């Protein structure tokens, strides 16, 4: 399952959440507000503290940058991809 590390008020995170909803993709949300344990862990684990962060464990992908994430989601899970798999 896709995982999204994000925080509520971030416009870049909102953009990715909208794309996930538009494509009707299930994902696990990891809210990571300032001062949270998840945010601290993420900085140590990934070595970078940038949001949003999309993790696609099936494809071993860790991705920052909302535009890159949205393009990846569209290319990998977009409507044409879903229809061809049915």
What is the meaning of each model-derived region?
Residues 1-8, 14-86:
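GST-like domain detector, emphasizing the conserved glutathione-binding G-site
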